[in-house]
């Protein structure tokens, strides 16, 4: 069977993964990874990663900067929409009542959804505005470190 290879797209995906990991986010690649991470006590920030421009230009940079704050989540994790489809679908099962959105952020406390920033809260905004939105959620739900 003939199979296309898209090295440029693969490079973009790998760069997007690397940026999230370098910012301190743990990759969740399987549904089991998601369940294990979301069972951890405390607060968890979930970055629903994507290859779109607003993910690379706004969401990932905002995620990297937002966590340098007096109050921040206990755990930082990421799933990759369109890539790790089963893991992303499992994560979205925890976001009860929220439509699928990527990129996006979900803040969980003890495995329960507290708040969500959707693509429309990210796209068209400056990264600093998204940082401020995330840090406002940290102020409300997270402990000082």
From Swiss-Prot:
Signal peptide boundaries: none
Superkingdom, taxonomy of origin: Bacteria
Pfam families (alphabetical): Disulph_isomer
TM region(s), chain numbering: none
Any one Gene Ontology BP term: cell redox homeostasis
Coiled coil region boundaries: none
Entry similarity comment: Belongs to the bacilliredoxin family.
Name used for this protein in its record: Bacilliredoxin GK2368
Organism whose genome encodes this protein: Geobacillus kaustophilus (strain HTA426)
Organism ancestry: Bacteria, Bacillati, Bacillota, Bacilli, Bacillales
């Amino acid at each position: 069977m003939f199979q296309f290879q898209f090295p440029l797209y693969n490079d973009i995906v790998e760069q997007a993964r690397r940026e999230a990991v370098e910012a301190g986010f743990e990759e969740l690649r399987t549904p089991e990874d998601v369940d294990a991470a979301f069972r951890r006590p405390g607060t968890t920030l979930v970055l629903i990663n994507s290859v779109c421009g607003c993910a690379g230009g706004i969401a990932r940079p905002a995620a990297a900067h937002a966590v340098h704050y007096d109050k921040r989540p206990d755990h930082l994790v990421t799933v990759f929409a369109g890539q790790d489809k089963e893991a992303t679908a499992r994560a979205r099962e925890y976001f009860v009542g929220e439509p699928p959105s990527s990129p996006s952020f979900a803040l969980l406390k003890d495995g329960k959804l507290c708040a969500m920033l959707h693509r429309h809260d990210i796209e068209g905004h400056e990264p600093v505005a998204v940082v401020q939105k995330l840090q406002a959620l940290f102020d409300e739900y997270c402990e000082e470190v």
